Amino acid sequence: TGEEFEESYDKLILSPVAKPTQPRLPGVGLDKLFTLRTVEDTFCIKDYINANHPKSAVLAGGGFIGLELAENLRELGMDVTIVQRPKQLMNPFDADMASFIHNEMRKHGVKLALGHTVEGFEERDGGVDVLLKDEQPLHADMVILAIGVSPETTLAKDAGLELGIKGSIVVNDRMETSISDIYAVGDAVQVKHFVTGEDALISLEGPANKQGRIAADNICGGDSRYTGSQGSSVIKVFDMTAAVTGVNEAQAAKAG
């Protein structure tokens, strides 16, 4: 509602979401550009499609959201192109596994423009040009940005909590922050990777649910511990289901 007021507490749990990454590029504020993170974002995109009947879309980003968007827009009969800087979709997967996803997307008519850097957006002929470095622009009736998320930790920062990777909230294994009686859980907390033991930012529903239960148990006098996230995730695109857990080859090599 926008109302501001003060509230006292004995124990406080922060559970902020991750927010869509907004690139600082020319034209990012055009009215034919969208991001998708919340239910309201979904309604906004759906309303635009119902009102304007776009025939084509460019999706910037080839992660979970980008792939699921591509499938849904293809089901509506739209021409869909995914563009991103990495040369493979779904970075958590090894390249040889991602190649199967590439084939599945192409089989269902999704165009892939991989290894291209987006430099901005311009309106033209009733649509949007996606400007690429050293390449001809991609033109579409609408563009959806799905290039990742970052922690929404404005409140945590203002409160003076210790922050970590990408501004995430640092917690211990009891989900306690650097300030006594304040706990944090969910997409915006820094965790330990279960396999490597390194600090990580893993925004997934399963770990967030478990962290909430652990924080609640500790607030109620228990002694529950969060031992880390494995990064287990699964996606279904068209007729293929793909899953990943632990670390991929590149992460394993980096961790030694």
List each language-model region with its residue ranges.
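A Rossmann-like FAD-binding core segment of flavoenzymes
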Residues: 1, 7, 75-173
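Cytosolic Rossmann-like ligand/nucleotide-binding regulatory domains
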Residues: 253-256
